[in-house]
Amino acid sequence: MTTAFYPGSFDPITNGHLDVLVQALNVAAKVIVAIGVHPGKAPLFSFDERADLIRAALEETLPERAADISVVSFDNLVVDAAREHGARLLVRGLRDGTDLDYEMQMAGMNRQMAPDIQTLFLPAGTASRPITATLVRQIAAMGGDVSAFVPGAVHQALQAKRK
């Protein structure tokens, strides 16, 4: 049984993240969605809020696979966190060539530190390719409609943050 580790900030989770997650579930029996916690960063949503939004998004979009997905936090190296959770596969989504260049560097460094852990690159679908959590936050903060880019629970949470 393959366990995949899908790290990210997920601030907030977007339809692009869900696209990659669905693909990951096609190759792994279990996927661990790992929220990176960085003490120096001030995310829009707290860890608990992000975890709740991920769970709500899964119930909304992938209820039949929710049992195959867990949500954890980590504040150490991705490869160390993956090992701690028994995962030997890192999942990374790619939107464009810029993502590929960056992710190839990261995969190379991770491979040096942890040769037992492989990185799996999954291309974003056409509809989710332009979506980034940063753009979603910016558009929502200016009162724009982000409902096409995020699950319903996230859209509601972003609206509540704006009030």
From Swiss-Prot:
CDD domains: PPAT
Protein name: Phosphopantetheine adenylyltransferase
GO molecular function, one term: ATP binding
Pathway participation: Cofactor biosynthesis; coenzyme A biosynthesis; CoA from (R)-pantothenate: step 4/5
Function: Reversibly transfers an adenylyl group from ATP to 4'-phosphopantetheine, yielding dephospho-CoA (dPCoA) and pyrophosphate.
UniProt family annotation: Belongs to the bacterial CoaD family.
Compartments in which it is found: Cytoplasm
Top-level taxon: Bacteria
Lineage: Bacteria, Pseudomonadati, Pseudomonadota, Alphaproteobacteria, Hyphomicrobiales
InterPro entries registered for this protein in UniProt: Cyt_trans-like, PPAT, Rossmann-like_a/b/a_fold
Residue(s) at site: Transition state stabilizer: 17
Coiled coil: none
Annotated EC: 2.7.7.3
Record note on quaternary structure: Homohexamer.
GO terms, biological process: coenzyme A biosynthetic process
HAMAP family in the record: PPAT_bact (MF_00151)
Residues reported in the UniProt entry to bind substrate: 9, 41, 78, 92
Cellular compartments per GO CC: cytoplasm
Keyword annotations of the record: ATP-binding, Coenzyme A biosynthesis, Cytoplasm, Magnesium, Nucleotide-binding, Nucleotidyltransferase, Transferase
Cofactor: Mg(2+)
Keyword Metal-binding belongs to the record: no
EC class: transferase
Reactions catalysed according to its record: (R)-4'-phosphopantetheine + ATP + H(+) = 3'-dephospho-CoA + diphosphate
Main location: cytoplasm
